[in-house]
Amino acid sequence: EVKASKKWDHEQVVELITKVNNYWQANNKPEVRAFWDNAAYHTGNMEVYKMLKDQKMLDYSIRWAEHNDWTGATEANPAKWKYKPYGEGKQHVLFGDWQICFQTYIDLYNIEAAKGNAAASEYMVKRAKEVMHYEAYSEPTDYWWWSDALYMVMPVMTKMYKLTGDTKYLDKLYDNLLTTDEIMLDKETNLYFRDGKY
């Protein structure tokens, strides 16, 4: 039997989350790229903001989004967009490591839209809409060929559905997930391998 060494109350948990998040923000500037290694933090920071309503935390993610012009990978020509093999360049627009940033951009947009600023804030989700619409209406279903993509892009698809009302995002999520299951899901353990190479 596993027992926790300490019972935490709500205030203690909030205090610890605040302490850790404040430390992170004090020691890491937000002016960094929108790739997964930075973007994953912002998905958590947005959840902390939703819980605590601390404007300083929200401002940190806004500065990061503004630094990246509300984009992921920046290639403008869809004919040059790719998602494999692995790459960190501007042409990897369809690669989930460059799409996780859209989770935060959509969250930031929704905050503004709730204040009645939807039209004035459309720039926040313009690139997300462009990229994810393209992907949702494309034929491939093997976009998520490594397990991290499930955390990175599945939420983007559900957020895009909620943002637009277009069920194609849910259809694409389902189709992509079926392919992911085929290439990575271990049927005995019901756990995912790291990627399709295993």
Each predicted region: which residue ranges?
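Long, well-ordered core segments of solenoidal/helical folds
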Residues: 11-31, 59-82, 119-141, 167-193
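Extracytoplasmic mature domains of secreted/periplasmic and thylakoid-lumen proteins
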Residues: 80-87, 91-158
